[in-house]
Design a protein with these regions (language model features):
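N-acyltransferase acceptor-side catalytic subdomain
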Residues: 1-205
Length: 205
């Protein structure tokens, strides 16, 4: 993991002003493992984004949504979503970041998108929003396709509310299959500047 030269040692939360300033400047926090309290600031040379007009919805996912008719909610079980995302053998979400995301959620900057089927939470995602930018942090599924359903709904909502940037931080084969692309940090910062200075309709209601 490449860090930005700053290391926060054994603290329970990151300062709200500091974390928002970091995201607004193209920098984000990660931990090496969930067992360590230290947090590193990351500024990759290449960034992953999903252009909001390029998200790909497979026919099978459309059929799944039509058949199962999942219910989508925002921020009803934010901490459960973060815990679900961190409940893996290897994860970068440690206790410091968990506390930070909870703080951001209470302040209105961190959002969860939750998928319910038969009144049960089956997965979702969470991220940070600053004006016209949404920074996707992590997602997980208990039942098949739950995270894809959450992502599909979120991107539709962001598009309707005139957001211009969906940041995935890095890319993976899974994200590429959904429409993610990789751009340089220089190009990313130009998109970021426009997005965080853009007035948009609030998406998370």
């Amino acid at each position: 993991m490449k860090n930005h030269g700053i290391k926060a040692n054994s603290i329970k939360t990151l300062n709200l002003e500091t974390i928002l300033k970091a995201y607004s400047n193209g920098i984000f926090p990660m931990a090496e493992t969930k067992f360590e309290d230290d947090v590193f600031w990351i500024e990759p040379k290449f960034r992953g984004i999903i252009p909001l007009d390029a998200f790909r919805v497979s026919k099978s996912l459309k059929r799944h949504i039509q058949k199962r008719k999942p219910i989508i909610k925002f921020n009803q079980n934010f901490e459960t979503i973060v815990k679900g995302c961190s409940n893996r053998k290897e994860t970068w979400i440690n206790s410091t970041l968990y506390n930070t995301y909870s703080l951001l959620n209470k302040a209105g900057y961190a959002q969860s998108v939750e998928v319910y089927e038969n009144n049960k939470l089956t997965g979702g995602l969470f991220g940070i929003n600053i004006n016209g930018a949404f920074f996707g942090e992590s997602m997980y599924s208990i039942s098949p396709n739950a995270s894809k359903i959450a992502l599909n709904f979120l991107i539709e909502r962001l598009s309707k509310c005139h957001y211009t940037l969906f940041d995935t931080q890095f890319i993976s084969k899974h994200l590429i299959s959904l429409g993610a692309i990789e751009i340089t940090q220089e190009s990313y910062l130009k998109l970021l500047d426009k997005a965080i200075n853009k007035k948009v309709d609030y998406a998370f209601y």
